[in-house]
Amino acid sequence: MTTPDEKTFATLTKLFEEEFGPIGDRQVLYVHAPGRSEISGNHTDHEGGHVIAGSLDVAVDGIAVATDSNKIRVADEGYPTFEITLDTLDIQESEKGTSASLVRGMAHEIAALGVEPHGFDFAFTCSVPSGGGLSSSAAVEAAYGRAMETLWGAPAIEPVTLAQMSQRTENNYYGKPCGLMDQAAVCLGGLAYMDFEDQAQPKTQKLELNFEDHGYALVLVKVGADHVAATDDYAAVPREMQDVAAEFGKTRLCEVNVADFDAKLPELRAKLGDRACLRAVHYWYENGLVDKRWAALNAGDIDQFLVLTRESGASSAMYLQNVVAKLGSQQPSMYALALAEHVLDGRGAVRIHGGGFGGTIQAFVPLDLVDTFITKMNGWLGEGSARHYAISDKGAYAAWL
């Protein structure tokens, strides 16, 4: 479907006209960008590793109308309307960490293709939970990018190229470090395997697969702690992995030979500490698990996929250590994982999801247990904490209505 359903369009039109006035007979552009779930490859993307991700049935949906001004005005349902001027597309230090920085960053990227930026009004809703590890920011970036691409008459942008633009925007304009997986999953759509060793041209493959057809539901559970608050903890993961790589004169772990790492471990431990070494161990182990899980999914072997997913979850907890930020009495992610394991009772699989340190956990739940699982997790963690998601086949796009 390349047009919004009737209810979504009515909501968007109401929001737009409340903020910007009647649309009248002006041409309307519809924009859609899904959220994503990391299916496998926990913190491997920023080291040039492998990932499997899927776009989800939650999304940024918006409508845009061109104007004669040099301003982009944005109405985001539930948040104050804001605007930026197009006088300069340079990084604004005062905007870092704000929604305006994403607009300016994507405008800079699209304008760099050789097109003239023009003003427009954009109203959108977002059903992607914020701070829950489903990449709401990547969906917003992709939505802005597709809107600008179409409104400004830019050449067609390939999904991975748009993802790279979005990543640069988040890194440089918003000021948050991130790999390419979030943006690539949002832009590609469906279930996708990604190899990030070649940063300029990542390799991607896609697979049509519905977990429900294999007897399992993809359930994400909000743990009750927003991972946005753990930016420093998140940033320490790639920093420590890359500290290890730097000891070999490299920038990412994908460039380091594992045998060389093994030979130098005592020296690395003495200089960088245990955690950096453990995180490097996780990278290579998890990277191998990604490839094995992709092979299992392609073979339709869901049981093997689940065995490997449980191994991945253990590696994240023990070696990557992105479940608990600081040991203490409050450990919401570990608490949620324990409760999920308790309900699953050896069936399915559960793991930390995405960046970690809060946000969400991911569970593959047998279909006959889904209602019980969601009811119990909601009872323990709060109504609406657990939700059953489906893989969506559409990546970010824009279409004239």
Description of each model-found segment:
Residues 1-36, 61, 65-96, 193-351, ...:
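C-terminal nucleotide
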Residues 1-51, 84-89, 95-213, 370-373, ...:
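Gly/Ser-rich oxyanion-binding loop with an adjacent helix/lid
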Residues 50-69, 188:
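Structural signature of FAD isoalloxazine-binding scaffolds in flavoprotein oxidoreductases
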Residues 55, 99, 329:
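Short, conserved glycine- and acidic-residue-centered signature motifs
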Residues 131, 295, 360:
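Short, flexible active-site loop motifs that bind/organize anionic cofactors or intermediates
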Residues 138-139, 360-365:
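FabD-like malonyl-/acyl-CoA
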